[in-house]
Amino acid sequence: MAAKLIVFVCAIALVAQSVLGTGCGCCCRGCGCGCGGCGCGCCENFRVCSNSAAPTGLSICSENRYKGDVCVCGEVPFLGTADVCGNMCSSGCGCIDYGCGNGCVGITRSCGGCGCGCGGCGCGCGGCGCC
């Protein structure tokens, strides 16, 4: 009887985690990139400390690999959070101006003077103002 009760409680816990979509809070699902750096030795200029839950309603999965310099410009649809796993050895900085409530769901404006000290990345964006 006790074994059936234990199996029942474990099944309820599994269903609750599946329905609620929350993880265990172990930061990036065990990739080893703890708060303040990714552990690969080249992330001194890219300090991020966040432990947000992954999106549960809308999910976009991309398995692209980028090598070399990458500069992103323009308006990007963005709903809530992003879940990124793996080693990300990055340098540079960026700014996000998140707007909502006016019908625009996305990064609505890129800011040039964000105070992050990058001063220009030289990535050849053509003056888009993203760096």
Curated annotation (Swiss-Prot):
Magnesium as a keyword of this entry, yes or no, is no
- Region Right arm (Gly-rich tandem repeats): list its residue ranges: 111-131
Query: Per the UniProt entry, what are the Gene Ontology biological process annotations, in alphabetical order?
Result: chorion-containing eggshell formation
The stretch of residues making up the signal peptide is: 1-21
The GO cellular component terms are: egg chorion
State the superkingdom: Eukaryota
Answer yes or no on keyword Signal.
yes
InterPro entries given in the database record: Chorion (IPR002635)
* Region: Central domain, residue numbers: 47-110
Role, per record: This protein is one of many from the eggshell of the silk moth.
Q: Can you name this protein? A: Chorion class high-cysteine HCB protein 12
Species name: Bombyx mori
